[in-house]
Amino acid sequence: MSQGEIVQVIGLVVDVKFSIGKDLPDINNALKVIKSDDDSIILEVILEQGDGVLRCIAMESTDGLRRGMKVEDTGSSISVPVGPDTLGRVFNVLGQPIDGGPEFPADHPRSGIHKEAPKYDELTTSREILETGIKVIDLLEPYLRGGKVGLFGGAGVGKTTIIQELIHNIAQEHNGISVFTGVGERTREGNDLYFEMKASGVLDKTAMVFGQMNEPPGARMRVALTGLTIAEYFRDVEGQDVLLFIDNIFRFTQAGSEVSALLGRIPSAVGYQPTLATEMGQLQERITSTKKGSITSIQAVYVPADDYTDPAPATTFAYLDATTNLERSLVEQGIYPAVDPLESTSSALDPEIVGQEHYDVATRVQHILQRYRELQNIISVLGMDELSDEEKLIVARARRIQFFLSQNFFVAEVFTSVPGSYVPIKETIKGFKMILDGHLDDLPEDAFRGVGPIEDVLKKALKMGVTPSDPEAKALLEK
């Protein structure tokens, strides 16, 4: 392997000079700086400066680096452990365990984090729904198996909570493998997630990779690729259907922006890196389904200042099959998950994919909620008394639908002391159809809040002293 030496250190940017005439390390190669016998730092080659000088980004703190230190070319990009042994473990960007468990032996299978996306003839085009057990998602923005989903929302509206619930439901109900990638988020959240998953018994079905907000931008920029590489092994070698969670894809863009500034590139719109679309494409094009297996990706997207036209979320939109938009006004009303049923979308909400009944119920729900939103302006100015009887009925049913879209989560049990619920798609459709058809008009609104299937509404109403008068509702209660 060729050797060079450090000629300049500017924060996290390190310039390394190699002898002219010898083979220079390739772009994206990992270089190793040996600080002492038991301490080294990994750099990644970003660009060539000329005269044998390569500009690199450090994956760790550059404390202690100085000019003249020897640097070795590893001959490949950053390589991380792959395979079934990664399940139940926690890694950093370099694939090193950070959970206090045993190190992986030198001969353990590894894979480089930089790869080409699958070729067109390797891709599959089947369109199948992935049941999540979350009513608002399954009804109005169903997720495709092997698709890409964006969870959009500002700070503190529940993106990470939905991701945790999805991991729980997929592991418990589908026995599926998940890879969780924490990109630039709070270390506390990662710590909580690890222990919650351990307690709920789903950790042994999950590999976790973290590059948190206290780490250098180089690590935060590459950690998503580390998680993706682990997921690709399960798809390509073991032929599995994998869920890849990225929390948060905005921090991936943000880290790229920091690296771009450190490299001295001229910024683009709103101060983002000029290579924003390219970097996003290199990541997203690898997240796909092949004839061997699938990767279903669920990505939390922080929206700066709730501005959806910001280049970071706007660039992400282009790659998504479904969007789940979280709305702060619903949080203020105490409706969880705070998913906006009218702004959230899915390309899978098509009668040929979900079936005619599902499609009809979903569009009727959207129509009645849209009409309610229009009537709210009249109500806020003139009050309910100015509405016609038909409009009052629309408002009453819309409010019941809005509350019935809320649901208790398994992962929130420790905070709420209320058991979570998993609702199959068939039960979800049945419940909303009964509300739309007027079978539950005589039940109080509060009975619909924070429940699972429609049977829970009837039981809750009974506890409140209200017995349904509708024959269909009575028959369901007797069952």
Curated annotation (Swiss-Prot):
<keyword id="KW-0472">Membrane</keyword>
<dbReference type="InterPro" id="IPR024034">
    <property type="entry name" value="ATPase_F1/V1_b/a_C"/>
</dbReference>
<keyword id="KW-0813">Transport</keyword>
<keyword id="KW-1278">Translocase</keyword>
<keyword id="KW-1003">Cell membrane</keyword>
<comment type="function">
    <text>Produces ATP from ADP in the presence of a proton gradient across the membrane. The catalytic sites are hosted primarily by the beta subunits.</text>
</comment>
<dbReference type="InterPro" id="IPR005722">
    <property type="entry name" value="ATP_synth_F1_bsu"/>
</dbReference>
<protein>
    <recommendedName>
        <fullName>ATP synthase subunit beta</fullName>
        <ecNumber>7.1.2.2</ecNumber>
    </recommendedName>
</protein>
<dbReference type="InterPro" id="IPR003593">
    <property type="entry name" value="AAA+_ATPase"/>
</dbReference>
<keyword id="KW-0547">Nucleotide-binding</keyword>
<dbReference type="InterPro" id="IPR000194">
    <property type="entry name" value="ATPase_F1/V1/A1_a/bsu_nucl-bd"/>
</dbReference>
<dbReference type="InterPro" id="IPR020003">
    <property type="entry name" value="ATPase_a/bsu_AS"/>
</dbReference>
<dbReference type="InterPro" id="IPR055190">
    <property type="entry name" value="ATP-synt_VA_C"/>
</dbReference>
<dbReference type="GO" id="GO:0005886">
    <property type="term" value="C:plasma membrane"/>
</dbReference>
<dbReference type="InterPro" id="IPR027417">
    <property type="entry name" value="P-loop_NTPase"/>
</dbReference>
<dbReference type="InterPro" id="IPR004100">
    <property type="entry name" value="ATPase_F1/V1/A1_a/bsu_N"/>
</dbReference>
<dbReference type="Pfam" id="PF00006">
    <property type="entry name" value="ATP-synt_ab"/>
</dbReference>
<dbReference type="GO" id="GO:0045259">
    <property type="term" value="C:proton-transporting ATP synthase complex"/>
</dbReference>
<keyword id="KW-0406">Ion transport</keyword>
<dbReference type="InterPro" id="IPR050053">
    <property type="entry name" value="ATPase_alpha/beta_chains"/>
</dbReference>
<feature type="binding site">
    <location>
        <begin position="153"/>
        <end position="160"/>
    </location>
    <ligand>
        <name>ATP</name>
    </ligand>
</feature>
<dbReference type="GO" id="GO:0005524">
    <property type="term" value="F:ATP binding"/>
</dbReference>
<keyword id="KW-0066">ATP synthesis</keyword>
<dbReference type="Pfam" id="PF22919">
    <property type="entry name" value="ATP-synt_VA_C"/>
</dbReference>
<comment type="subunit">
    <text>F-type ATPases have 2 components, CF(1) - the catalytic core - and CF(0) - the membrane proton channel. CF(1) has five subunits: alpha(3), beta(3), gamma(1), delta(1), epsilon(1). CF(0) has three main subunits: a(1), b(2) and c(9-12). The alpha and beta chains form an alternating ring which encloses part of the gamma chain. CF(1) is attached to CF(0) by a central stalk formed by the gamma and epsilon chains, while a peripheral stalk is formed by the delta and b chains.</text>
</comment>
<keyword id="KW-0067">ATP-binding</keyword>
<keyword id="KW-0375">Hydrogen ion transport</keyword>
<dbReference type="GO" id="GO:0016887">
    <property type="term" value="F:ATP hydrolysis activity"/>
</dbReference>
<dbReference type="GO" id="GO:0046933">
    <property type="term" value="F:proton-transporting ATP synthase activity, rotational mechanism"/>
</dbReference>
<dbReference type="Pfam" id="PF02874">
    <property type="entry name" value="ATP-synt_ab_N"/>
</dbReference>
<keyword id="KW-0139">CF(1)</keyword>
<dbReference type="InterPro" id="IPR036121">
    <property type="entry name" value="ATPase_F1/V1/A1_a/bsu_N_sf"/>
</dbReference>
<comment type="similarity">
    <text>Belongs to the ATPase alpha/beta chains family.</text>
</comment>
